[in-house]
């Protein structure tokens, strides 16, 4: 639903619009195959790997915050499990477990940092 709302909003905007979406691809090596892309996208949002938000400058004209965070608080406990459902991450873990661990932790820290920034931005009063 969020995607369709954002696409309608982008189309209605009287100027250029940009839509960025999480799109799993075959190179991610999704366990279970590419037929699971919708499920994987949903899991990416639930665990905090990907965040849903949109920015509509027209909201500012209405006295509203133009940045809207659509994602709920992620279930961070699922973050690592999400990574390990993709061959690109499990391959790294198999070849270099210590480096993989450090990178997995850094990825989660970065995802948390982004989410917290989005939460702060979404609470700005206009």
PLM feature segments, named:
Residues 6-10, 66-126:
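Metallocofactor- and cofactor-centric catalytic cores in central/energy metabolism, strongly enriched
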Residues 1-73:
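Glycine-rich ThDP/TPP pyrophosphate-binding loop and its adjacent helix/strand module
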């Amino acid at each position: 639903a969020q995607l369709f709302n954002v696409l309608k909003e982008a189309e209605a905007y009287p100027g250029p619009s940009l839509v960025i979406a999480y799109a799993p691809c075959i190179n991610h090596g999704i366990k279970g195959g590419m037929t699971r892309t919708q499920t994987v996208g949903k899991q990416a949002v639930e665990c905090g790997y990907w965040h849903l938000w949109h920015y509509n400058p027209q909201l500012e004209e209405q006295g509203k915050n133009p940045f809207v965070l659509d994602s709920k608080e992620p279930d961070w406990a699922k973050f690592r499990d999400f990574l390990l459902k993709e061959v690109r991450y499990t391959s790294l873990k198999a070849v270099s477990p210590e480096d993989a661990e450090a990178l997995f932790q850094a990825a989660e820290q970065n995802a948390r940092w982004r989410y917290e920034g989005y939460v702060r931005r979404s609470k700005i009063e206009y």
